[in-house]
Amino acid sequence: MSDGRCQRNDDSRSKIMSEYELLLYGDVWDAKRGRQRGKWVAVEGDEIEGVYDEKPGPAAEVKEVELVTPGLIDLHVHLVWDGTGDPVETLRRQSEQEQTIHAVAMAREQVEGGVTTVRDIGSTHDIAISVADASRRGDITGPRIYASGQTIIISGGHDPFWGMESDGVDAVRSSVRKQRDKGARVIKISATGGVYGQAVGEDPGMSELSREEVI
């Protein structure tokens, strides 16, 4: 929301359209100027048409809200996971179809919670890539999803439940190409051990992929 739009005069708009689709009244968070008190936000379809100091005209629907913010971004999600303390155990009990249904539901929850962009960096069966494609086409309700699908790991490495085991430079290069071909918009590698994923044998401070494999 730019400074100019927040100061926009309402005359031209009200003359062109007799009624807005939706007007929101409340505080607006502006990325440049912080919290702006008592603004009118005009919504047409899925876009914000303008932000005004005064009510710009009649509307089919008017809602009073506490705060309108820009869409939030979450850079580390796993849509196939649930919110339990041991989501890997849940994955082991679920079929691929159940995991897909869950991921679709989680995508919808992200949008309903104000998150409009996510980066999904690890999913079984490349489910997040399929969900990302469906969201982009408008087949489901979801945010913009940048998904890696399966992650690239060494044999026995971190997150084996959705890892593509890749040993050596050529194998890693091949795995990257395969993920790109599937539609991955980001590549996730497990360069070290982690703190969750395997019951034994993991050390987050230990290198797994070599420097040559990574670069």
Residues of each region from the PLM?
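N-terminal metal-binding scaffold of metallo-dependent hydrolase/deaminase domains
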Residues: 12-57, 66-68
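Divalent metal-coordination and catalytic microenvironments
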Residues: 26, 41, 46, 65, ...
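Metal-associated gating/positioning segment near the N- to mid-region
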Residues: 66-137, 212
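Active-site gating loops and adjacent loop-to-helix segments of metal-dependent hydrolytic enzymes
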Residues: 78-99, 108-111, 141, 149, ...
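Short, acidic/polar
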Residues: 99-107, 167-178
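Divalent metal-dependent hydrolysis catalytic cores, especially in the metallo-beta-lactamase
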Residues: 102-128, 142-153, 184-197
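Histidine/acidic residue-rich metal-binding segments in metalloenzymes
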Residues: 130, 171-190, 195-215
